Amino acid sequence: MTRIHINASTPYDVVIEEGALQRITDYIKPLKPNCHVIIVSDSNVAPHYLDSVKANMEHAGYTVCDYVFPAGESSKNAHQLIDLVEYMAAQSLTRKDLLIALGGGVVGDMAGFAAATYLRGIDYVQVPTSLLAAVDSSVGGKTAVNLEAGKNLWGAFKQPILVLCDPTTLNTLPDMEWKNGCGEIIKYGFLDVPGLLTQLENKPLITLRDSVSAVIARCVQAKADIVEQDERESGVRALLNLGHTFGHGIEKASHFEVHHGYAVAIGMVLMAQGAVKHGELDAEALEKLKALIEAHDLPTTTTITKKEILAAAKHDKKSEGATIKIVVPTSYGHSELKVVTHEELATYLD
């Protein structure tokens, strides 16, 4: 078992342990010994794990209800959120009760936002079941849904009281979801995580599957270190958005047919190409990045137009009036923050 403590405004632990899902009450009882519980999941994850988690919670004396919505990024919207919160109200949940987000990034984002806003905030636990959620989105307290204007534009910062990651749940993931998570893992490799790039270069995906718990722990520790410095993303936490400025534009323009990790991979390459043009990154580092991404069977190009990507960037959360904060790779394994105008941003895609 690996336990990583995050000293945020609401301190909590990230527990990474094989088989932990079967002992979920052992971790929740000390935090919430007696309450009503709502388990939020989606149509992909629920058939695998919902019944067993619900039975374990009920056996431990909890009153449990559940809410399952259609899987996919297209469900992460205001209408689905309101339906969830209305259901929570219909179940008479109180501020003393608990929400469990059982699923990947979409489940965690939307369920977390419901927990942040229902009755002005109730406790919640993240139980990530996708690689992307395990290494990134379940940690740090960012919650949100998408709007017509862009991705993650309606949300709140709300730290969970626990993140419980059972790597055995990743065994049911299709290959696409493994690759999706690898997009975010490669991102961490460009944020000075020691040895991560070397490991990914040696045996892409195969090594990752064999040592997934250690890789998850590396990424979570890296994110924890950043979140503890800058919980609400006023400074260094923006580094975690490497590949996201262009990546979010690709997701939105594709109507979310391009998955997040895939879009982040393309976004990293596009930003790196721009950095080479601006003299901020050498061409060899760009080629190594592209080779690493391709080795994980992720794309490095897109048919989405420059105009579409930049239109979405105008609604990026890091945009402030005429300027936007971007993350630029400046060497192989290292990236830096930079503030540019939207006109200057466009030159990175020329």
Which residues are covered by each model-predicted region?
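ATP/NTP phosphate-donor binding region
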Residues: M1-D97
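Residue-level signal for inorganic ion chemistry
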Residues: E17, I39, N77, P128, ...
